[in-house]
Amino acid sequence: MSTAPAAFDIKTFLATLTGAPGVYKMLDRNGEVIYVGKAKNLKKRVASHFAQRGSSPKQNAMVARVQAIEVTVTRTEGEALLLENQLIKRHKPRYNINLRDDKSYPYIYVSTHQEFPRLAFHRGSRARPGRFFGPFPSAAAVRDSLKTLQKIFPVRQCEDSYFVNRTRPCLQYQIERCTGPCVGLVGAETYGEDVTNTLLFLEGRGEALIDRLAQRMEQAAQRLEFEKAARYRDQISNLRTVLAKQLVAGEQGDLDMIACAIKGNIACVHVVFVRNGQQIGDRSFFPRMQDEHDAAAVLGAFIPQFYLDKEIPRELLLSHEIRELELFESVLGQQAGRPVKISWRLRGERAKRLELARANAECALTTRLASQQTIADRLRHLTEMLGLAEPPKRMECFDISHTQGDQTVASCVVFDRTGPLKSAYRRFNIEGITGGDDYAAMAQALSRRYQRIRAGEVEAPDILFIDGGKGQIHAAARTLAELGVENIRIIGIAKGPDRKPGMETLFQTGCSDPIVVKPDNPGSLLIQHIRDEAHRFAITGHRQRRAKTVTRSPLQAIAGLGPKRRQRLLRQFGGLRQISRADVEALSSVEGINRQLAQRIYDLFHDHGA
């Protein structure tokens, strides 16, 4: 007979707790971290949680679940803030305010270390050589900027593998979006001028760039190079148009305007990004929180989670005052390596712009509430349709995508009671199976995913949706049984007649009778949403994987054959087909290619039956 665990003895714990600064983790009976906090004085802060009984039902519920508290002492309160941020991101405690969307933000990348640098979209680590500009609020903002830059300064944006294998200029050259460095139509010095101008633009030195171009235009005109002068004139005109559209009145540097709106226990934080005096976009965030909090608490949780692992602007303008403002300025300044100012009492144009940001936060929150009401209604109907005792807290859906069995990718999308959890989405590149065997592909993806769930690294879903019929769910059930994973309802979504949405049939493990979905049932729309999202995510991953294979040249697999030698080969022979037909003697006649390297090139193509 099991007995309930003894209540946590807070008095005994506090008797030995230090008054130093640090971080504390509250754990429940299962050892799960349910709350992380920081403190200037650990003893006083931890004691305050237990002295606040009756302050709110959620506070009481949290304290009642505490079975242990772990403490880490730090030297300063600033160190405690940094550690608290890391622990919240790692554990995502139920009772903390959590920033849901934590994926890395996109940048513009310039490969300045190359002879002919390229401009590119970049997301992820910034460890490789070159320069990064950002972060941008969205991928669309980066692509819009790249498109604008390419119209003004024709710097290449193609992949290096594509660049080194060209034998003739591509379409970008024909439409005057590139100057053709891949085939020697422009020298490094002339090309470098466009790169320098691009960097000046990205650094926000627009007026200096216009002055530079105006000087070049006058010099070209004096030399009677009227075509070149006209090109500079057009660049200046285009630049003035772009700068006039983007300039934020009265602003010169980097700043973010951050506004918060709250209704009940749902909050929206709207951020307007200004870089080098130019507004580059805005974005709304919806932190997850279990209890009602004021704007000061929401912003105080948002700022460290959002900024401590990103490039920090020089100034943050807030819609509300936050607690410990000086501490935040100090820690952010240390991270940035320069002063960071946080302001909330604003006047004039800044106050008007922040009020607009607040209006956007209110609007986004209203839309979110309406959307959540729709999702809640659909979830209620789904619960009734499946005969569940309560709405599922978490659902996963898997799908498979490939082209005639090649480059197979499986997707896993995750939904909770508020909708899609995009930060929890995962893709799996499937290897070592017979091409086109969807059962084997699904088994491999499920095995890789649910091994982590069994190990407690990932939260288990209540429902596992599979895009398929009886065969797929039986295969899925076997995989989970082999892993020892239980208590997950597996449902197959079989397409209806003519694959029409809303005409699906659901198959469940342990149930012989299928469920025929009615098109007008709101639960049907939720199932379609989940399945379509899994399909979209799978096919996007498959296309990306296939594109990498298509753009990679077989010459790149040869050791000792670098980009310049590959380019010489292609120029001399005209293409891969001609290279594959050449003998060792002809290959070794190319500058920089000795007989041993020529033999390896010959063997590569002949081993492939070329």
From Swiss-Prot:
Swiss-Prot/TrEMBL keywords: Cytoplasm, DNA damage, DNA excision, DNA repair, Excision nuclease, SOS response
Q: Which GO terms describe its cellular component?
A: cytoplasm; excinuclease repair complex
- Using the record's annotation, list all stretches that form the GIY-YIG domain: 19-97
Q: Which SUPFAM superfamilies match?
A: C-terminal UvrC-binding domain of UvrB, GIY-YIG endonuclease, RuvA domain 2-like
GO MF annotations in UniProt? DNA binding; excinuclease ABC activity
Ranges of residues in domain UVR = 207-242
Query: What is a biological process (GO) this protein takes part in?
Result: SOS response
Question: Matching Pfam families, A to Z?
Answer: GIY-YIG, HHH_5, UVR, UvrC_RNaseH, UvrC_RNaseH_dom
Role, per record = The UvrABC repair system catalyzes the recognition and processing of DNA lesions. UvrC both incises the 5' and 3' sides of the lesion. The N-terminal half is responsible for the 3' incision and the C-terminal half is responsible for the 5' incision.
The entry's protein name is: UvrABC system protein C
> Which lineage is the organism of this entry classified under, starting from the top rank?
Bacteria, Pseudomonadati, Pseudomonadota, Gammaproteobacteria, Methylococcales
Q: Which gene encodes it?
A: uvrC
